[in-house]
């Protein structure tokens, strides 16, 4: 198994872990002025988001700025919080170098979103994934 940390190592924020060059676990941002984003632009086959905080989901729409449209797997509350915070990021930084995604990218998120409940296994990029309640915030998940 190949694991690459694209952010979130030795820092709090911009969590992004690429597994076997195909499964991306989280794709967050480090809030600040200017905000910082993961160090690479991966091209995953699927994305799994653990919870909706900016440091874990804040850069997810940027994954949809190119031609590929990987499915984004998350719980329903995580999806709603992540989309709401992305809308807020666009209001604050949209159209500037401080925001790596556009309104079109955010619209695409809804088109590739796949919501899952706890304890329901699902396939993602050749892996079987199951969410378990992490108890951090509503919808947060341990990802196994």
Describe the role of every protein-language-model region.
Residues 9-14, 18-70, 74-113:
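Pre-active-site segment of Zn-dependent metallo-hydrolases
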Residues 1-4, 18, 120-144:
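Catalytic core of the metallo-beta-lactamase
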Residues 106-126:
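Alpha-helix-centered segments that form part of catalytic cores
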């Amino acid at each position: 198994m190949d694991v690459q940390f694209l952010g979130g190592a030795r820092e709090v924020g911009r969590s992004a872990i690429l597994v076997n060059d195909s499964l991306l676990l989280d794709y967050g941002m480090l809030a600040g002025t200017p905000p910082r984003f993961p160090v690479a632009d991966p091209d995953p086959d699927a994305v799994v988001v653990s919870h909706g905080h900016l440091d874990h989901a804040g850069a997810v729409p940027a994954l949809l700025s190119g031609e590929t449209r990987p499915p984004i797997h998350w719980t329903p509350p995580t999806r709603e919080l992540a989309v709401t915070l992305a809308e807020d990021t666009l209001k604050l930084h949209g159209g500037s170098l401080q925001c790596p995604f556009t309104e079109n990218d955010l619209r695409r998120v809804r088109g590739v979103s796949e919501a899952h409940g706890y304890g329901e296994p699902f396939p993602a990029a050749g892996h079987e994934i199951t969410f378990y309640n992490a108890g951090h915030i509503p919808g947060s998940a341990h990802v196994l």
